UniProtKB/Swiss-Prot annotation:
It comes from the Eukaryota. The chain crosses the membrane at residues 2-22. GO terms for biological process: brassinosteroid biosynthetic process; brassinosteroid homeostasis; megagametogenesis; response to light stimulus. Pfam families: p450 (PF00067). CDD domains: CYP90-like. Heme binds at C415. Catalyzes the C6-oxidation step in brassinosteroids biosynthesis. Converts 6-deoxocastasterone (6-deoxoCS) to castasterone (CS). May also convert 6-deoxoteasterone (6-deoxoTE) to teasterone (TE), 3-dehydro-6-deoxoteasterone (6-deoxo3DT, 6-deoxo-3-DHT) to 3-dehydroteasterone (3DT, 3-DHT), and 6-deoxotyphasterol (6-deoxoTY) to typhasterol (TY). Required for the initiation of female gametogenesis (megagametogenesis). This is Cytochrome P450 85A1. It is a single-pass membrane protein. Its EC number is 1.14.14.179. The gene is CYP85A1.
Length: 465
């Protein structure tokens, strides 16, 4: 009996302490002018609920507090905005005290010169450097020929397979395609070591920044260190060779006639930026496009007809040209609709550099603002039957330029690699739908937050078309 009373007493003390901590943390962020909302626990905030409940957490908070509310996510006090007009203002006004505000784990792992982290003149330098690598001329003469050759050879390897994990295949496809464009003709051991480190880096970028052994954050930092070592060795090897290279790394290292000269650290961060920014969007969009096309035979029929028409006009092994890809109107519509419905990217983060008034509220300096676009993608006022896969809605080009369209970012941070990603996904779909039929094995769980991900893989049975 005595032991029971002690246990009850301890439990009461713990509950009281937890309640006091929650109240104390809430009071810390209760200031005049702040939006409504809850802040959760000290340090951790509401990160656990956010990551576990995902869209349901956001939806419930929106119902309680409206489209502009406060929380504490990934180690920082954060304002969440689901208002399309407010989002447009936030994304277009970087010069007015709003700069990129990505989680500390992402900044630490992707590098201080990463284009998503810098602003002002540094951002213009890194963005200009990237855009020079993916200009229309570069796309036509260098990038697309490499992408086309890679996709054909990569999908050739599936001829003898009956069942594939399309999640695994598209992740490797996206990584290897980007790495081929950055630095071609790499030795296999180098590629394998780089790939292992890169996959660990990706996991670490969305983690609580606690540097302890075994944490995703520590693994991500170690993976980035390994990637830096590999890139240093590769760059030194190229300098020692005296050869001229026409891949992305070659242009980044070029000194003469380079309008955007970068330091070695900036080059390494640029390489990681290119790999990271395209990896998840290209791989996941490719996987989800196949799922939606499988579930909507009419859309698959129209997409396949578009691609078979190109093949009929070409010799058997003739590659796709840039004008071919630009002419794939329905394919582009499928890519946009897949990105919208699957919500490959849930939103973007900004940070205030001074106290700001937004939407009638006073936002303190140093707070992050999460422009959360998932709910906007499903807004019935913006998209008719928003939960239905309907690529035909995008055949009206004007939809891409609407203020409510955040599929590829917006404002001054509109994704600079958007067209490169579309080229890669279009090429993949071209060679897949003209070579294979497929059906889902079934039974695979598909998570949609914080990343679109199948924990045990997403399996397809394929056969020649």
């Amino acid at each position: 009996m005595g032991a029971m009373m002690v246990m009850m007493g301890l439990l009461l003390i713990i509950v009281s302490l937890c309640s006091a901590l929650l109240r104390w943390n809430q009071m810390r962020y209760t200031k005049n002018g702040l939006p409504p909302g809850t802040m959760g626990w000290p340090i951790f905030g509401e990160t656990t609920e956010f990551l576990k409940q995902g869209p349901n957490f956001m939806r419930n908070q929106r119902l309680r507090y409206g489209s502009f509310f406060k929380s504490h996510l990934l180690g920082c006090p954060t304002l969440i905005s689901m208002d399309s007009e407010v989002n447009r203002y936030i994304l277009k006004n970087e010069s007015k005290g709003l700069v990129p505000g990505y989680p500390q784990s992402m900044l630490d792992i992707l590098g201080t010169c990463n284009m998503a982290a810098v602003h002002g003149s540094s951002h213009r330098l890194m963005r200009g450097s990237l855009l020079s690598l993916i200009s229309s001329t570069m796309m036509r003469d260098h990038i697309l020929p490499k992408v086309d050759h890679f996709m054909r050879s990569y999908l050739d390897q599936w001829n003898e397979l009956e069942v594939i994990d399309i999640q695994d295949k598209t992740k490797h496809m996206a990584f290897l395609s980007s790495l081929t464009q950055i630095a071609g003709n790499l030795r296999k051991p180098f590629v394998e070591e780089f790939k292992t480190a890169f996959f660990k880096l990706v996991v670490g970028t969305l983690s609580v920044p606690i540097d302890l052994p075994g944490t995703n954050y520590r693994c991500g930092i170690q993976a980035r260190n390994n990637i830096d070592r590999l890139l240093r060795e590769l760059m030194q090897e190229r300098r020692d060779s005296g050869e001229t290279f026409t891949d992305m790394l070659g242009y980044l290292m070029k000194k003469e006639g380079n309008r955007y000269p970068l330091t070695d650290e900036e080059i390494r961060d640029q390489v990681v930026t290119i790999l990271y920014s395209g990896y998840e969007t290209v791989s996941t969009t490719s996987m989800m496009a196949l799922k939606y096309l499988h579930d909507h035979p009419k859309a698959l029929q129209e997409l396949r007809a578009e691609h078979l028409a190109f093949r009929e006009r070409k010799r058997q092994d003739e590659p796709l040209g840039l004008e071919d890809v630009k002419s794939m109107k329905f394919t582009r519509a499928v890519i946009y609709e897949t990105s919208r419905l699957a919500t490959i990217v849930n939103g973007v983060l900004r940070k205030t550099t001074r106290d700001l008034e937004i939407n009638g509220y006073l936002i303190p300096k140093g707070w992050r603002i999460y422009v959360y676009t998932r709910e906007i993608n499903y807004d019935a006022n913006l998209y008719e039957d928003p939960l239905i896969f309907n690529p035909w809605r995008w055949m009206k080009k004007s939809l891409e330029s609407q203020n409510s369209c955040f599929v590829f970012g917006g404002g001054t941070r509109l994704c600079p690699g958007k067209e490169l990603g579309i080229v890669e996904i279009s090429s993949f779909l071209h060679y897949f739908v003209t070579r294979y039929r497929w059906e889902e094995i079934g039974g695979d769980e598909l998570m949609v937050f914080p990343r679109v991900f199948a924990p045990k893989g997403f399996h397809l049975r394929i056969s020649p078309y």
